[in-house]
Amino acid sequence: MKRTGLWLGLTVAVIAIAVIGFVAYRYLAPVRVDIVAEADGVPFTIETIPHSVLARPGEMIKVVYRIQNDDLLPVSAYGAITIGPAKNQDQMQVFLSQCGGINTYQSTGPEDYGVMFRVQPAGLSGSAHLVLKHTFTPSTPR
């Protein structure tokens, strides 16, 4: 009888430690953020630096979009920011986006545009993998 109680208590303790460890991991573990860019109807070559980052919850992260206008003339484009998956948009806050909104991109060579953001912990219902995407479209009809 004593041995059964010991094994039962040990099993409950191991399960409790595993559950506490899993919850702590979900709240403290870094969130993988893929940095993506898409040029839709504009003659841009875009490089993201870095392509992916492991962001600790609450840490301010800076990434760079290196944009080169491949046209001979300056191009005015609109940069739209989307965060995926859509149900976890509130998990990321973008504080600065130099390439968001309407900008004129010169044809003199690649230019660096910074984006600063912060992520919240995945928690129990969040995502451990997010995507920060900038889509560039013409701001005026061509």
Give the label of every model feature segment.
Residues 1-45:
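Membrane engagement elements in two modes
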Residues 28-32, 40-48, 78-84, 99-102:
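Generic detector of short, locally flexible boundary/turn motifs and exposed helical patches
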Residues 31, 59-61, 73-77, 109-113, ...:
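Residues at beta-strand starts and edge strands
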Residues 35-63, 104:
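Beta-sheet-dominated interaction scaffolds and their linkers
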Residues 51-85:
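Mid-length scaffold segments of soluble, non-membrane domains
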Residues 53-54, 59, 70, 96-122:
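Intrinsically disordered, low-complexity Pro/Gly/Ser/Thr-rich segments with frequent PxxP/GP/PP motifs
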Residues 64-67, 115-117, 132-134:
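Buried hydrophobic-core signal for structured, non-transmembrane domains
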Residues 73-96, 103, 119-142:
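Terminal connector regions
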